[in-house]
Amino acid sequence: ETFIMPGPPPARAVPSTLIPCTQDRDFMIYDWASRHEAACRIVRETHPDLLFIGDSITHFWGGAPVDEPHRDILQKSPETWNLCTAGMRAVNLGFGYDRVENALWRLRHGELDGAEDNAVCVVLLGTNNLAENTDGEILEGIRAVCREITGKLAKAVIILQGFYPRNSAREGTAERIAGINLLLNRLAAEENFIYTEPGRVMANSDGYVPEELSSDGLHPSAAGYARIAAVLAPVIRQAAEREK
């Protein structure tokens, strides 16, 4: 009788959320590589104490760097951005159509270099991974982003935002987002981050995002950003006091 030694278990594939990479999915309205270079330069030169790390929801709000010639499209509410960041040196590290792995690449290639060691870092990522990844893969990618931040900025205070609501034809999207937000809340508790869900103020009681707050059911309008800022500004002030 032939005895066959059992082999090692099959290697678990590394999820895409943990493989840093660049992207150019939004090339029609901005240049990803140029924005990255501008962001690195601003961080080096201004030594920010407030960083917003995210995708288009963050990118389209306001602040520097500014993408020319599409300033009007990509700066939906610079007034509320200024109110939310008042008294701090803020940089907008939001990049349209970024997935978690794209933000991870950016942070590993200079976007944190020069920031204050105790900077407040506001993180909102993952909605662009919903169609590509499992909830667990998204969570692990966001965890990796947060560890990248604390690995480079030892005293950073991380504000982890839950996913914003989105009007979707895909059944179960709202329930999935609610489940992911529970996971993010748990991650924040484990890692001593601050967790917040300002996106809740974007939706009606039935979970629908009205047109006056978002023309596409996800990205805030100026009125939507005003609501977000009203929730987020006091959380940022609370975070800034942690290291004083």
Regions found by a protein language model. Name each.
Residues 2-96, 101-116:
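Serine-esterase "nucleophile elbow" of acetyl-processing enzymes
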Residues 9-12, 21-22, 26-31, 142, ...:
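Mature catalytic domains of secreted/periplasmic carbohydrate-active enzymes
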Residues 49-54, 89-94, 119-125, 129, ...:
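Structural recognition of the beta-strand scaffold that forms the well-ordered cores
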Residues 86, 154-155, 189:
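Proline-centered flexible-loop/turn and helix-kink motifs
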Residues 92-95, 125-138, 166-173:
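Surface-exposed cleft-lining segments at the edges of enzyme active sites
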Residues 98-105, 133-142:
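Glycine-rich anion/phosphate-binding loops
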Residues 137-145, 174-181:
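Charged helix-capping and loop-helix junction motifs
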Residues 165-244:
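Catalytic His-Asp segment of secreted/periplasmic serine-dependent ester chemistry enzymes
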